[in-house]
UniProtKB/Swiss-Prot annotation:
Gene3D superfamilies: Chorismate lyase-like. The gene is ubiC. Belongs to the UbiC family. It comes from Paraburkholderia xenovorans (strain LB400). Residues 200-212 have a biased composition (Basic and acidic residues). PANTHER family: CHORISMATE PYRUVATE-LYASE. It catalyses: chorismate = 4-hydroxybenzoate + pyruvate. InterPro entries: Chorismate--pyruvate_lyase, Chorismate_lyase_/UTRA_dom_sf. It comes from the Bacteria. Residues 192-227 are annotated as: Disordered. It is an enzyme of class 4 (lyase). The lineage of its organism: Bacteria, Pseudomonadati, Pseudomonadota, Betaproteobacteria, Burkholderiales. This is Probable chorismate pyruvate-lyase.
Amino acid sequence: MSIRFVAADAHWRVAPLPGLSAAQKDWLTRGGSLTAHLRALGAVAVRVTREGVALPWPDEHAALGLAPRAPVWVREVVLAVEGVPFVAAHSVAPLAASAGVWQAMRRLRTRPLAELLYSDSSVARSSLVSRRLTARHPLYRLAACAIESLPPHALVARRSVFERHGAPLMVTECMLPALWAHLATVSGAGGSGDWSAHPRVREHGRPLEHTASRAHPATRASDEQRR
């Protein structure tokens, strides 16, 4: 399965925009769990900002193969590292799937969605796509609620579709300015968190494949301990 897009919407790209920074290109194409990558920077907390039934965004329904006004289950969270918001995430699944194949997403509360996506061998993931966000996009407005102020046209986001037993779940992640500021500080100090010091598997342009084998090592170790 691949993400299906409306031909008129050319904003989402398989390869990151050439004008983005090296750090942005790196984080937009990292495979595995984003939560696990954030944990390498510090303690991660999940704050749920919205959860319930809604309508898909204009650039979501076609990608999920849904009718424009088909109801979906939405989960929106902010991922904070050491108390500072680094990522605003928006996940959406067909309403029927959220009560069936993906029903566990309704019970996560403040646990990360990665717990479902990277410990189940029946879950597969599409390639990653990314784009720059403007104030007109609903994800930009979601990000604005997570922090006090946003510079115009300063946000980038990525998305992919996870599939389990034929049911899709789309995850869109918007990186916030504090993430780039932190990476720049760590990189400038030559610390162990330097983004360039840790090569990662790149997911853009890859076909759908199972996620359990691609989980971050820390995630796999945690899963094994729970067993």
